[in-house]
A protein has these predicted regions:
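Basic/polar N-terminal segments that are highly enriched at the extreme N-terminus
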Residues: 1-6
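Conserved acetyl-CoA-binding loop-helix of GNAT-fold acetyltransferases
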Residues: 92-105
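A conserved beta-strand-loop-helix scaffold within acyl/acetyltransferase catalytic domains
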Residues: 7-88
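Short polybasic/polar patches that bind polyanions
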Residues: 27, 91, 108
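Conserved GNAT acetyl-CoA-binding A-motif
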Residues: 107-116
Length: 116
């Protein structure tokens, strides 16, 4: 989903995508942040119906990401929107909103209407 500025929103798919996501978590919340979502969980999230997606500049650099887990509670499928970050150098460009709308679009396409 390319934007007018050439930014593309898409699922994380390569080793470098996952590593960039981990680095952006540390850049956003600090090197000592203890709740970094590791590469293995980002991949499992996707395999289990969750979302691990990024906003990428035309040069391939990750500008932001969104992460959430899909599950079942009381017999109802729902999505837990866990984390969103935008690189400080790319803030105030609407990327956070675009990532949340991307997340919504993907979830609705999967038939998931409840997000917490």
């Amino acid at each position: 989903m390319p934007g007018h500025d050439g930014t593309t929103l898409r699922p994380l798919s390569s080793q470098s995508d996952y590593e960039a996501c981990i680095e952006l978590q540390r850049k956003t919340w600090g090197r000592d942040f203890s709740d970094v979502v590791p590469l293995s969980i980002l991949k499992i999230t996707q395999k289990a119906g969750g979302i691990a997606a990024g906003a990428f500049a035309p040069d391939g650099r990750m500008l932001g990401f969104v992460h959430g887990l899909t599950g079942v509670r009381n017999g109802q499928v729902f999505h837990w929107s866990h984390m969103l970050a935008v690189d400080p150098e790319a803030r105030d460009l609407g990327l956070g909103s675009r990532l949340k709308l991307y997340q919504r679009e993907v979830l609705l396409g999967m038939g998931i209407g409840r997000v917490e």
